[in-house]
């Protein structure tokens, strides 16, 4: 005999589909929640993969086929190193390179950052064919070696609006040097131009210096052995294109993982919405499901039927989410150029890299979230007693068989929060947050019973009934307020985290911006190598009327590890470090005869530079590293890979570098800022400099700009808070509606006992007030616990900085009050729909 086919497929068509059509808006909301979660997570993945792919391609086009790249750990190195490297028997080809990031101005005034690469076209051709200029028609071949000739890639030509034969200006300090566009290069990525190496050194002021040497080794030569034989001078390190890509991937990993987790939060709340929608659906179809059970549909088939409904919601939401995520990623790549708002891929314009495997994986996450959300309603349908349910007496919500689960999950969440990160990602902290959320929700029935037991018993009949039902049927509260607890706790946690971060950044800005006015050379990038205001201009500024004090600041990059990104080295007059730096912890006394430095928190985590330790600084190629003493740690929210502050006198003595990137100016009380700015521009013009390249900013402007960027970066969290609260309230509405509809006989009996409609409605509203009030209280407490993990664990492990925990009680109070009012109103609306003649007549159904 052949086994009978399962009736689930037929029931999906004739039983489930009409329900879906009849309540299309309700189910569409669940589909929308899954859609949003999948779309956000998939778009973050696409943006990052596309940006990384484009960055890798750009690195390969610049580095070409080189096996090794030699560069200075800080600044450049003497070109005298090149001949010895080129003559080594294991080196087949050695190409010297000068590379400077600067500002370019097109013929029509367009400004854009430009990477200028100087190389020897005859030597570099086999190594980096993408960087070899293709001269425009009519140009003499000798223009390849002309001092003031440059060839631009497509990105540079587009941004500057130039063609062959046009003239552009590039910035060198506060001077503008004219260059003629003579050809093109096919290299992709950010805007760049290629010059003959001698011309680049002359124009950009790097005579006698090289940025790097690209090496092609002979067949069979091993990189490690060649490096050992070369005996490179101190401060010169080796690198490869793959290592550069891996460094950027490592730096951006924490940022993109956090964005992905935020996106999965939407999926988490979407699962609760599916749970609430299907709970309502099962409650409304309780008698129909019972009839199907009497007619032969097994408990297992009822379980499968509801799970198939949840999977259908997840599948539709996932398919639409993948399409929406693709559109979001495409739009973001056009508007943000793959930057993700974190500044990790500056200057590149990636194309969308769509992956069917990634689409399948993220779509599967959406289906899985929906199925998990439908599991409890499916179990309720499976455990339905058909005989009782046909009479409307079935209870779809039973007491938990595992009362210990909630406390165990909470304890597990606390334990996981104490574990270190995994490969730089706070994996255990994320699992801790998940355990805290699930454990808190599992504790809802017990917490409701405990809180109601502690509350005084009301005397009036209606409040007494509302109070007693909430206490005695508290296991139904898990369904009624689980959405409120989940969504409110997430919203509270995000609110506290963002408020803590914003408050800490504001306090940090107050310390690091003590001057009245700041000046710098104009550029699209704050770290451009050619941005040098010059020591002479600084001396002139100190004599400008209205300037009481002028301090020059030098910012440069320093490589301390091949696997980690470069750290920022800040040289400035320090004086009393405890007053000029936002220190964290105690400041150790300086050691006589040793250079003192002050490191950011990231330096402690990434490089082990704790106070009292000695850190080797390769400040000058060809000289031994400086053994610097770490006096203290300071808070820095601007440089995720770490920063070091060194006194300017020590820096200039050790490096001979007199350059200045920024000026900090303290003005006299009677001085007018516009007059001081004009006087500084005149001083620059008197030295033959381009005064228009100087930009000024007051601390207020810098603070406003920084906080505006901060708010824009966290816009997605504000949006997720709104989504979470909306989904939670919708789930509460669905749960209350399900319970009220299942209690029509109870309301009818109360009416027969003499309760008026208003009193019965008051009972329903009272239950809603009690349950949502308790839900808000639990959500607030759980959210504060989660926020502690986010602030004290996730942020330090992800970005290597700490912040002060700040709870905005006014906003949190309004948030909880709004949830309680909305939940109570929802219960009243649901009660009005269930109370009436139908409720009175429902009592006769058993007679």
Where are these regions (language model features)?
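Alpha-helical transmembrane segments
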Residues: 26-27, 38-64, 256, 279, ...
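Small-residue transmembrane helix packing/gating motifs
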Residues: 62, 144, 184-219, 512, ...
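Small-residue-rich transmembrane alpha-helices
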Residues: 276-278, 312-344, 357-383, 409-422, ...
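Alpha-helical transmembrane segments, especially those used as permease/efflux helices
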Residues: 1-5, 9-10, 17, 21-29, ...
């Amino acid at each position: 005999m052949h086994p009978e086919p399962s009736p689930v497929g037929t029931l999906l068509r004739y039983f489930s589909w009409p329900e879906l059509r009849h309540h299309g808006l309700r189910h569409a909301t669940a589909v929308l929640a899954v859609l949003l979660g999948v779309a956000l997570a998939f778009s973050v993945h696409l943006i990052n993969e596309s940006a990384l792919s484009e960055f890798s391609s750009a690195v390969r086009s610049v580095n070409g086929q080189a096996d090794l790249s030699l560069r200075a750990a800080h600044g450049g190195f003497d070109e005298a190193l090149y001949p010895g490297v080129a003559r080594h028997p294991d080196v087949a080809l050695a190409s010297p390179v000068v590379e400077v990031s600067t500002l370019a101005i097109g013929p029509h005034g367009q400004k854009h950052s430009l990477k200028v690469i100087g190389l020897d076209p005859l030597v570099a051709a086999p190594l980096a064919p993408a960087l070899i200029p293709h001269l425009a028609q009519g140009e003499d071949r000798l223009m390849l070696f002309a001092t003031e000739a440059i060839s631009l890639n497509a990105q540079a030509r587009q941004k500057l609006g130039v063609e062959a034969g046009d003239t552009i200006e590039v910035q060198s300090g506060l001077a503008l040097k004219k260059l003629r566009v003579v050809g093109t290069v096919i290299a992709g990525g950010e805007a760049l131009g290629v010059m003959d190496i001698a011309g680049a050194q002359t124009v950009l002021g790097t005579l006698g210096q090289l940025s790097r040497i690209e090496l092609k080794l002979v067949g069979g030569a091993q990189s490690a052995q060649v490096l050992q034989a070369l005996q490179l001078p101190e401060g010169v390190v080796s690198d490869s294109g793959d290592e550069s890509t891996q460094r950027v991937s490592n730096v951006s990993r924490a940022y993109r993982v956090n964005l992905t987790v935020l996106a999965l939060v939407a999926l988490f709340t979407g699962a609760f919405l599916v749970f609430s929608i299907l709970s309502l659906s099962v409650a409304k179809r309780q008698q129909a499901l019972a009839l199907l059970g009497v007619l032969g549909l097994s408990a297992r088939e009822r379980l499968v039927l509801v799970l198939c409904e949840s999977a259908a919601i997840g599948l539709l939401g996932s398919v639409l989410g993948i399409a929406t995520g693709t559109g979001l990623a495409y739009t973001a790549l056009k508007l943000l150029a793959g930057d993700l708002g974190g500044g990790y891929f500056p200057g590149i314009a990636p194309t969308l890299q769509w992956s069917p495997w990634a689409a399948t994986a993220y779509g599967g996450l959406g289906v899985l979230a929906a199925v998990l959300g439908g599991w409890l309603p499916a179990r309720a349908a499976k455990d339905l007693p058909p005989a009782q349910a046909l009479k409307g007496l079935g209870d779809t919500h039973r007491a938990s068989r595992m009362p210990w689960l909630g406390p165990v999950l909470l304890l597990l969440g606390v334990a996981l929060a104490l574990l270190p990160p995994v490969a730089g990602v706070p994996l255990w902290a994320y699992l801790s947050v998940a355990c805290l959320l699930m454990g808190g929700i599992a504790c809802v029935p017990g917490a409701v019973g405990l809180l109601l037991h502690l509350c005084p018993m009301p005397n009036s009949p209606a409040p007494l009934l509302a109070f007693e039902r909430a206490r005695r049927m508290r296991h139904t509260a898990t369904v009624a307020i689980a959405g409120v607890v989940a969504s409110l706790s997430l919203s509270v946690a995000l609110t506290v985290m963002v408020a803590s971060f914003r408050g800490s950044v504001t306090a940090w800005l107050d310390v690091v911006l003590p001057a009245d006015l700041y000046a710098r050379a104009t550029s699209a990038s704050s770290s451009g190598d050619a941005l040098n205001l010059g020591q002479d201009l600084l001396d002139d500024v100190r004599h400008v009327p209205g300037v009481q004090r002028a301090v020059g600041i030098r910012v440069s990059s320093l490589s301390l590890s091949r696997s980690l990104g470069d750290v920022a080295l800040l040289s400035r007059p320090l004086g009393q470090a405890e007053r000029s730096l936002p220190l964290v912890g105690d400041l150790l006394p300086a050691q006589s005869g040793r250079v003192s430095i002050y490191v950011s928190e990231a330096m402690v985590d990434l490089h082990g530079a704790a106070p009292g330790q000695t850190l080797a600084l390769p400040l000058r190629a060809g000289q031994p590293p400086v053994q610097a003493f770490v006096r203290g740690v300071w808070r820095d929210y601007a440089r995720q890979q770490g920063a070091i502050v060194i006194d300017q006198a020590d820096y200039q003595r050790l490096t001979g570098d007199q350059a200045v990137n920024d000026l900090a100016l303290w003005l006299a009380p009677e001085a007018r800022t516009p007059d001081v700015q004009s006087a500084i521009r005149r001083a620059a013009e008197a030295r033959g400099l381009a005064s228009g390249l100087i930009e000024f900013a007051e601390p207020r402007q810098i603070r406003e700009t920084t906080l505006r960027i901060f708010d824009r970066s966290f816009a997605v969290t504000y949006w997720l808070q709104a989504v979470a609260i909306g989904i939670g309230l919708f789930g509460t509405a669905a749960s209350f509606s399900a319970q009220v509809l299942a209690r029509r006989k109870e309301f009818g009996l109360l009416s027969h006992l003499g309760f008026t409609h208003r009193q019965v409605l008051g009972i329903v509203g009272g239950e809603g007030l009690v349950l949502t009030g308790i839900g808000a209280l639990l959500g607030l407490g759980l959210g504060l616990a989660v926020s502690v993990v986010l602030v004290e664990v996730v942020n330090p492990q992800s970005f290597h900085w700490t912040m002060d925990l700040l709870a905005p009680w006014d906003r949190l109070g309004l948030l909880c009050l709004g949830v309680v009012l909305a939940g109570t109103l929802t219960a009243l609306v649901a009660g009005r729909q269930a109370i009436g003649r139908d409720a009175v007549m429902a009592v006769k159904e058993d007679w």
